[in-house]
């Protein structure tokens, strides 16, 4: 009893024991006959039947066959693309495959649709010729008064245009051709008496000699324009100064804009210009200092910075001295220190001027309580490039200065 209960029905056991279901002929099944499909297709009784059911079966078979063929083709293309990516990289492999025709561009497939879009974008890029042959040839007509570009004339007159331009126009879209013609040097309007780069290169050594002559002999108009540009620069940098004063300073500096700016800055250019006699005095001082520059450069070693009237006095001072000392406090004449208060220089400008870059920016010290027992060497004895102006100013007889801050501060004459 227990064995009979555990045993299943005989039909299920027989179905499980048998082999899997074999495919049957669909045409025979439509007509009520069951026949195995293996070896039956050629001998089927209804293989040429045109009834509705058999026609539907034939259409279904055709669609399935097309899908299988498409999947096989896509799988083959993916394998080829994967191999090319391993060999040449991602983008280069796809571009090389598309160029060689291994993979035709398909708009409905993402990988190869990007390749086709890249090829279209490359065709629309404007192309430029380094040495256009149309410029070298003398077949180009002179520019008309209307100012039309050469590309319009070449389009209207087919006999005038060069074959290179026609070949370039054939490869690409019309929009790309118009952009390439507009951006190319061929399309720029030619003025009367103006030479193109192609004509200049075709002239040879004669044109080179003429260019050298032009460079060696500058025209007076170019010199005048350069001088005007220098004065304009000075007027823009110093709008509060008069133009005549700036012209005097520029002439004294040999028409050097940088040197003129340094002269004006060192003579109080940042402050507002003085009125009356003091303004003329400042202009005369700037002009004299600019004229003294060639003589000083001829006698002494060449220096990149101009020598101002107060430059030597400033260079002989120690870094520990006050930036703007009171001259009567040191017992000296107020007029002996030219960079005093009459020029309107504040300690900030004195510390960051062109000739005091070697001085450290610090608060002024009082000279009464700064270690009076120590004798400081003058700054000329130190090997600072910004402080050394002339080696002849060194103390030959005294190795150290007699005073605390040097001869100029202590109002002692310098021994030569």
UniProtKB/Swiss-Prot annotation:
Signal peptide: none annotated. Residues 133-145, 198-208 have a biased composition (Low complexity). One of its GO terms (biological process) is regulation of transcription by RNA polymerase II. Residues 133-226 are annotated as: Disordered. Residues 228-263 form the DMA domain. One of its GO terms (cellular component) is nucleus. It comes from the Eukaryota. Residues 25-72 bind DNA. Keywords: DNA-binding, Metal-binding, Nucleus, Zinc. InterPro entries: DM_DNA-bd, DM_DNA-bd_sf, DMA, DMRT, DMRT5_1_DMB_dom, UBA-like_sf. GO terms for molecular function: DNA-binding transcription factor activity, RNA polymerase II-specific; metal ion binding; RNA polymerase II cis-regulatory region sequence-specific DNA binding. It is found in: Nucleus. SMART domains: DM. Disulfide bonds: none annotated. Pfam families: DM, DMA, DMRT5_DMB. Belongs to the DMRT family. May be involved in sexual development. This is Doublesex- and mab-3-related transcription factor A2.
């Amino acid at each position: 009893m227990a064995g009979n209960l555990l045993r299943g029905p005989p039909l299920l056991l027989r179905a499980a024991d048998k082999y899997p279901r074999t495919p049957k002929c669909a045409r025979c099944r439509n007509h009520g006959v069951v026949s195995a499909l293996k070896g039956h297709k050629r001998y089927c009784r209804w293989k040429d039947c045109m009834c509705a059911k058999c026609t539907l079966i034939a259409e279904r078979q055709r669609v399935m066959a097309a899908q299988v063929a498409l999947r096989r083709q896509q799988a083959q293309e993916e394998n080829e693309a994967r191999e090319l990516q391993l060999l040449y990289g991602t983008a280069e492999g796809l571009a090389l495959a598309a160029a060689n025709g291994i993979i035709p561009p398909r708009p409905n497939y993402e990988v190869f649709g990007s390749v086709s879009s890249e090829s279209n974008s490359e065709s629309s890029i404007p192309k430029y010729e380094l040495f256009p042959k149309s410029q070298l040839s003398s077949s180009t007509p002179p520019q008309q008064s209307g100012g039309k570009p050469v590309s319009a004339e070449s389009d209207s007159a087919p006999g005038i245009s060069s074959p290179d331009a026609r070949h370039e126009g054939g490869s690409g879209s019309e929009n790309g051709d118009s952009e390439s013609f507009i951006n190319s040097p061929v399309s720029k309007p030619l003025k009367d008496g103006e030479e193109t780069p192609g004509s200049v290169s075709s002239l040879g050594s004669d044109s080179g000699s003429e260019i050298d002559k032009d460079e060696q002999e500058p025209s007076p108009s170019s010199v005048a324009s350069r001088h005007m540009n220098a004065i304009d620069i000075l007027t823009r940098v110093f709008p509060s100064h008069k133009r005549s004063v700036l012209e005097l300073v520029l002439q004294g500096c040999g028409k050097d804009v940088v040197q003129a700016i340094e002269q004006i800055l060192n003579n109080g250019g940042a402050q507002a210009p003085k009125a009356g006699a003091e303004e003329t005095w400042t202009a005369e001082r700037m002009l004299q200092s600019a004229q003294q520059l060639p003589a000083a450069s001829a006698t002494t070693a060449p220096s990149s910075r101009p020598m101002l009237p107060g430059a030597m006095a400033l260079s002989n001072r120690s870094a520990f001295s006050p930036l703007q000392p009171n001259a009567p406090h040191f017992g000296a004449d107020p007029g002996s220190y030219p960079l005093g208060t009459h020029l309107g220089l504040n300690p900030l400008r004195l510390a960051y001027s062109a000739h005091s870059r070697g001085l450290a920016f610090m608060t002024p010290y009082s000279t009464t309580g700064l270690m009076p027992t120590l004798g400081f060497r003058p700054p000329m004895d130190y090997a600072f490039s910004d402080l050394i102006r002339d080696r002849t100013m060194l103390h030959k007889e005294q190795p150290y200065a007699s005073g605390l801050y040097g001869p100029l501060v202590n109002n002692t004459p310098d021994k030569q």
